[in-house]
Amino acid sequence: MPKTPVLMDHDGAVDDYLAALLLLTMDHVEPLGIIVTPADCYIQPAVSITRKMLDLIGRSTVPVAESTVRGINPFPQLYRRDSLVIDCFPILNEQDEIKTPLLPESGQDFMVRVLREAIEPVTLLITGPLTTLAVALDAAPDIEAKIQQLVWMGGALNVRGNVAIDLEPGQDGSAEWNAYWDAEAIDRVWQTQIPIVMCPLDITNNVPVTPGFIRKLAKQRRYPLSDLAGQCYSLVIPQDYYFWDVLATAYLGQPEFFQLREWETAIVTKGRSQGRTKLEAGGRKIQALDSVDIDRFYAYILQQWAK
């Protein structure tokens, strides 16, 4: 059975690495590479973590590229510093050298090259802002035809966003962070005909990382993937934390767990609501993950990380 070609673009937060770990456990997926966008991270440790992680799981042939794009509204340093901590985890630093290659070209140029060279249309899995894709589309509009679908963790349709007003007083609380980082990039992608599957806060708010899940993960820490995932989640125990990027990635592995719903949408690019993914009659049609079989999802993640 032919494998599904997938190019991943993540932005270096805790759940981005775990989403990559999940993707690479999927036997039906052919990973074409991983791009790291400098958003919810410090880019050098985020790239380092990605490469060390690939070494850990024996996938050092998967190339990594560093995007050099910039957003409009930076993530708080409080969020981004997790990348500095994870890069020092002992489990990622047993070896003296990193084998996984870091490509000399930028992430946006790598995206263009991969799509142009692809024999069949490629699925893009993006778990951060869409800026790298937007820049790639501006540089090479022809790549749009090579994209099978975009699976994106981002946006909030019928719920409030997660940009806290105390951290961003210029925002009204309606935006989700991946959209708020660069609303103009989201709007650029919305102008295309690329089929979009959103994993918005509407569904992720219902899928928390629970103490019960953490306990089950701890009981299988003899597996390197579970050990690394457990250490990553230990960084976020004091806060409410959800399966954002991991949930979006799980859709590629087990789409039958999910119900999708079509919405007509538009992107607010200016003012206090910038980054809002709003419903608008006659707007851009997208598919959104609407509900998930939570018990089957939790069981699937534990199964995939028992390696």
Predicted regions and their residues:
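Metal-dependent C-N hydrolase catalytic cores
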Residues: 2-4, 47-117, 284-292, 302-306
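Short C-terminal domain-edge/linker segments immediately following a structured domain
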Residues: 38-39, 63-68, 94-99, 155-157, ...
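Short secondary-structure transition/capping segments
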Residues: 44-45, 77, 209-213
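Short, mixed-charge aromatic SLiMs
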Residues: 41-45, 73, 156-160, 266-282
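A broad structural signal for alpha-helix termini and local helix breaks/kinks
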Residues: 57-58, 140, 253
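Conformational coupling and interaction surfaces
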Residues: 1-3, 19-31, 177-180, 184, ...
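Active-site histidine-anchored catalytic micro-motif
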Residues: 2-51, 96-198, 204
